[in-house]
Amino acid sequence: DRGVCYCHHCGYKLYVPDDSEERERQQRKENYNRARKLPSHFRRPVFDPKRTTLSEKLEQYWTQERCLAQRLLADLRITEERVRLPESSKEENCLCFNYFEGGTLINTKYRSGRKHFMMVKGAELIPYNIDAVLDTPECIITEGEFDAAAFMTVGRKDVISVPAGAQSNLNWMDRFVESHF
């Protein structure tokens, strides 16, 4: 028995794990919860829900220029903030991609209209939208947050983006292999 159920009417397939697989899944969740404890050397930003009120300009950029679903601004808890960015040494208005794990804000990526970027100094690098792949049989891994949002716009929920863009160093993935993949 493979644990696969099949509906001959609609073609829907469903996998039902056996007891040992269920125990393994529970163990992975427990390991995941233990791993979520903040190591002493990491900083965490504080999420301010007041910043989820976005400017009309940012909303137009998101929906009209990027052609992304309006609902994702709230679903992904996108915020907007004026931040001093190192590339320009000036304060710039930024779209903020907030990196959550288990409902806790872990990091924030600030992106200005001039394509200047910054992440919270000393914060842990984790994949963007990591909780979306918890207990899913497959996922899509993209290079950037906008790419992930594009997949979500067309209906995929199991999408993450690598931290800090495309690179050959995949060490960030090690912590999530047992708990998320």
Each model region followed by its residue ranges:
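TOPRIM metal-binding catalytic domain and adjacent DNA-binding surface shared by DnaG-type primases
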Residues: 18-102, 124-135
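Short metal-coordination and nucleic-acid-contact micro-motifs, chiefly zinc-binding Cys/His arrays
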Residues: 3
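The −1 position to Zn-ligating cysteines in a subset of zinc-ribbon hairpins
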Residues: 6
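Cys/His-rich microdomains that often coordinate metals
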Residues: 14
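Phosphate-handling DNA/RNA-contact segment within nucleic-acid enzymes
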Residues: 85-181
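Short Cys/His-rich metal-coordination motifs, predominantly Zn2+-binding knuckles/fingers
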Residues: 10
